[in-house]
Amino acid sequence: MSRYVGAIDQGTTSSRFIVFDREGSVIALAQAEHAQIYPAPGHVEHDATEIWTKTQSVMREALEKGGLQPSDLAAVGITNQRETTLIWDRKTGKPLHNALVWQDTRNDRLVAEFARDGGRDRFRDLTGLPLASYFSGLKLRWLLDHVAGARAKAEAGDVLFGNIDTWLVWNLTGGTEGGLHVTDVTNASRTQLMSLKTLEWDEGMLRTFGIPKAMLPKIVSSSEVYGETRAPFAGVPIAGILGDQQAALFGQTCFAPGEAKNTYGTGCFALMNTGEEPVPSKAGLVTTLAYRLDGQKPAYALEGSIAITGALVQWLRDNLHMIKDSAEVETLATTVEDNGGVYFVPAFSGLYAPHWNEGARGLIIGLTRYVNRGHIARSVLEATAFQTHEVLDAMAKDSGIPVKELRADGGMVANNTLMQFQADMLDVPVVRPKVAETTALGAAYAAGLAVGYWKGLDDLKRNWGVDKRWTPKMDAGRRETIAAAWSRAVQRSFDWKTDED
């Protein structure tokens, strides 16, 4: 058998290819960033052709770094930024428009239009999701309404829809020459077009949103052999697909109900495995697919999605020039003992879970002449922990299962100040695993299981280990006081943007 498994990790800011061995250790890695396109306030786009080019580049580079050939790979898995929405011409393979990124809010009027009859939760029982600009279905509707000729071509089957997983699989398996048009259940569950119960496209949702079924990919499991790569990586089975946050849950081996992880990246995404039945949320979370292995029952999850966390540190660096690199925010934050009474609500594109307020906008509140740059930096880090606290509290209310330990991954887990404050706010331990690349590892695990590289979930659990554990140190009175202050700040951010803006 081939010695390794590869994973394409296509994220919001970069594309990576990582090669893992049987113990889940990284053998080779390559990464390439792609452009972030901001054509107007609230608009965020990616060039899908650039993403495909960069994906091929990092695959070549990683194999070269490892001295490997495609034949050394038993399988390749794919994990991707979810919700980012693309349409392309089946015959030419060219996108009809830049991809609308998950953060893009240009469809907010469509959201409001559909919410007028039945409110934002009118489709929640069916799809698990509230009406929000975040999800793919109304991004796709916007493209069909605004790209000349797109709807007619889509109805004829000449225009295809996909999230980034679908785009990559289609190109990897031949593109215009017989490329496979598929998506897995985790990505499909983020479109608001799939029934959580049947795991199929829902005809009623398609009619309501005005989406031609002919343009949609086939829904498949998260772990099976879908097809093989074509040149220049010919013959490698593509055998795993997971949306990035579900991939992190899988890579963190959260296979039992009540086990939870939080990924600290551009945004924050907390998921809790809830088992074989979907748990409806009454506390502002979304109900989603955790994963589905080939031939097995699906596992469901509760998710709290937070739009801006690591991106707030980038904003501090790129827009305010308060720091030179992202790591410097911790140094600056530790120059002060606390936040000085300052709270930063990073509602740059509204607020996601648990508030779902499209009109919220960012604010810094509590400023006095006492406040300095250190307090601002600390408030930036604390905003991530406060938002995560809100989401984990909602998970406990919905599931009836309090989180006993939070498994953390993503770039921000290197920040000890943030992780300690997170443990303090949650009042439970926060754990960083030995293998940091949990998202890519989850995709590799899904692919490896499908081809027998790993025999079962127990093999994966044995690979997981603790790198560092943070335990709570804050007293309950202090925790309650600052949590209440944060809640007041959040309330003041609501509904700043109006239809006239």
Curated annotation (Swiss-Prot):
Taxonomic superkingdom: Bacteria
Positions that bind ADP: T12, R16, T266, G310, G411, N415
Organism of this sequence: Methylobacterium radiotolerans (strain ATCC 27329 / DSM 1819 / JCM 2831 / NBRC 15690 / NCIMB 10815 / 0-1)
Signal peptide positions on this chain: none
Record-level Gene Ontology MF annotations: ATP binding; glycerol kinase activity
Name of the protein in question: Glycerol kinase
Gene3D superfamilies given in the database record: 3.30.420.40
Biological process, per Gene Ontology: glycerol catabolic process; glycerol metabolic process; glycerol-3-phosphate metabolic process
Keywords: ATP-binding, Glycerol metabolism, Kinase, Nucleotide-binding, Transferase
Name of the gene this protein is made from: glpK
Binding-site list for glycerol: R82, E83, Y134, D244, Q245
